[in-house]
Amino acid sequence: MMMSLEKIKKILPHRYPFLLVDRVLEVQKGKYCKALKNISGNEEVFQGHFPSQAVLPGVMIIEALAQTAGIVIHSGKEDTSSSEIVFFAGIDKAKFRIPVIPGDQLVLETSLINQRRNFWVFEGKARVDNKLAAQAEIKLMLQPL
């Protein structure tokens, strides 16, 4: 199931400049999500990282993966109108392989590894041109607002 930006905004609370998922290509309910983030030279982060050679900070890639995993969590919920929010709970095994620069398209994939009550663990991978740019184990928790 594909998702437009408008549908993503109904699921994720993030907004510009911190909404880091542009489109969802595929969702397997409660298990997996494949999404896109187009990297524009107009991203605010490039004003300081780095002005002479723009490189997307690794923390932004990790956040994009966490948002993609958040879509997985919400896709598995029966009641999407509840007042709960997904929070970042931890990160393990983060590795950054290649720089991500303006003009790149990040393909974000998150797969559920484990879930217990309101705590989820995902494997996340970000690719550019089919090359692994970053990977990490993402830990998220669902909490009431």
Report residues per predicted region.
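Hydrophobic beta-strand-centered segment that forms part of the acyl-chain substrate-binding groove
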Residues: M1-M2, A69-V107, A133-Q135, M141
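Short aromatic-glycine motifs in intrinsically disordered, low-complexity regions
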Residues: L5-R15, S82-S83
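Beta-strand-rich interaction surfaces with strong enrichment in secreted/lumenal proteins
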Residues: K9, S52, F96-I98
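HotDog/MaoC-like acyl-thioester-processing domains
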Residues: P13, I101-D104, S111-L145
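Conserved positions in beta-strands of structured domains
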Residues: D22-L25, D92, R97, S111-I113, ...
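Active-site helix/loop of acyl-thioester processing domains in fatty-acid/polyketide metabolism
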Residues: V24, L56-T80
